[in-house]
Amino acid sequence: MQGYIQESDFNLVEEGFLARDLMEEIINEVSQTEDRDAFFVADLGDVVRKHLRFLKALPRVKPFYAVKCNSSKGVVKILAELGAGFDCASKTEIELVQDVGVAPERIIYANPCKQISQIKYAAKNGVQMMTFDNEVELSKVSRSHPNARMVLRIATDDSKSSARLSVKFGAPLKSCRRLLEMAKNLSVDVIGVSFHVGSGCTDSKAYTQAISDARLVFEMASEFGYKMWLLDIGGGFPGTEDSKIRFEEIAGVINPALDMYFPESSDVQIIAEPGRYYVASAFSLAVNVIAKKEVEHSVSDDEENESSKSIMYYVNDGVYGSFNCLVFDHAHPKPILHKKPSPDQPLYTSSLWGPTCDGLDQIAERVQLPELHVGDWLLFENMGAYTIAASSNFNGFQQSPVHYAMPRAAWKAVQLLQRGLQQTEEKENVCTPMSCGWEISDSLCFTRTFAATSII
């Protein structure tokens, strides 16, 4: 084992474990106290399962986890143990990853517009791979980080994505030749091309077009004497099963596009920047009802079967905390009752509100719930992406803590996977059986296509 994560970092649980089981234990424990604070349960086994699924679906692609999506220490540690790289966007994210013990060669500073002091920090700490999309960035890097290995980020069609990024980042194709020429004149090393089709992309064809465009930029670069060897296909992969498009569908489009434009014989190494893919479904959140208010309504004759009141519930996490995903990530979290109601309990039109003094701190509007009481719990699933990472301490409310769990079989799979990664350095093709009865495939093959140490 690499030693990035230890058994003391999580609760080791038996097979058949569900996040709900650990939540139940914690709820029972904290309900004996006055502090019934909101909390997360993170199933690291789900992260491991996603990693195996990624390697199977995109065998030529090395994942560089997008730290901005969820910077929880447990997530960073388990992905470091699994051999993933890391997509960092700031000095703070680089510090976080390197504090865990990750080598700088496994980090790409994937922010095309960086503060000069942070470029110098990357240089001082050995982080060489970084992205750019404009002339000013090239000038800054040439002065502040002469050993940088630059990756040209190109614009894409992200019109079918929930969070469009090309409005802010990415050079249009018509500008790429000029940027490459300038890089050559400044003696800046350009090693490859990157793109991002947007977060929450629902159009897999966007990847095909972007990969095709990247091939054109590779050809432009050769005109200036560059021999590019890296393609970064970004992220945007779905992280929950209820997404409009499945991850395997996207992979089914990416793989033939890579084979067409960047065949294995080209010796181009492929990386990606999955974020929500890894963590969205791994995190569940429990919140406690801290206050309630009934609102009476007049009822007409034709509405006599409807309730005459609605109820406002106030819970101890909100939009300024973990539910910032409503604002920044177009999320629509749905509450799950902790206590199963009786069939004859009436439902009331209800709204859920966070704990802060801001009237905008509303989690849900017009949801049908049985009557709840102060001290009751509500659960929310699929809360791992862009929740913790953007939460604040507004009004003095603290971020909800995370309790990590790892199924024993998943931990065994991590150990088997780690042995395979170590053997990769010694043999070109190794097939490590995954015989714990838990994994998604009968075997996991490791090839020299992208070993953990192959970016140097």
From Swiss-Prot:
Keywords: Cell projection, Cytoplasm, Cytoplasmic vesicle, Golgi apparatus, Membrane, Nucleus, Polyamine biosynthesis, Pyridoxal phosphate. Its main location: nucleus. One of its GO terms (molecular function) is ornithine decarboxylase activity. The keyword Cytoplasm applies. The active site is at C357. One of its GO terms (biological process) is positive regulation of catalytic activity. GO terms for cellular component: axon; cis-Golgi network; cytoplasm; cytoplasmic vesicle; dendrite; endoplasmic reticulum-Golgi intermediate compartment membrane; granular vesicle; nucleus. It is found in: Nucleus; Cytoplasm; Cytoplasm, Perinuclear region; Membrane. The record marks K68 as: Not modified. The keyword Cytoplasm applies. Monomer. Interacts with OAZ1; this interaction disrupts the interaction between the antizyme and ODC1. Does not form a heterodimer with ODC1. Antizyme inhibitor (AZI) protein that positively regulates ornithine decarboxylase (ODC) activity and polyamine uptake. AZI is an enzymatically inactive ODC homolog that counteracts the negative effect of ODC antizyme (AZ) on ODC activity by competing with ODC for antizyme-binding. Inhibits antizyme-dependent ODC degradation and releases ODC monomers from their inactive complex with antizymes, leading to formation of the catalytically active ODC homodimer and restoring polyamine production. Belongs to the Orn/Lys/Arg decarboxylase class-II family. ODC antizyme inhibitor subfamily. The N-terminus domain is necessary for its localization to the ER-Golgi intermediate compartment (ERGIC). This is Antizyme inhibitor 2. The lineage of its organism: Eukaryota, Metazoa, Chordata, Craniata, Vertebrata. The gene is azin2.
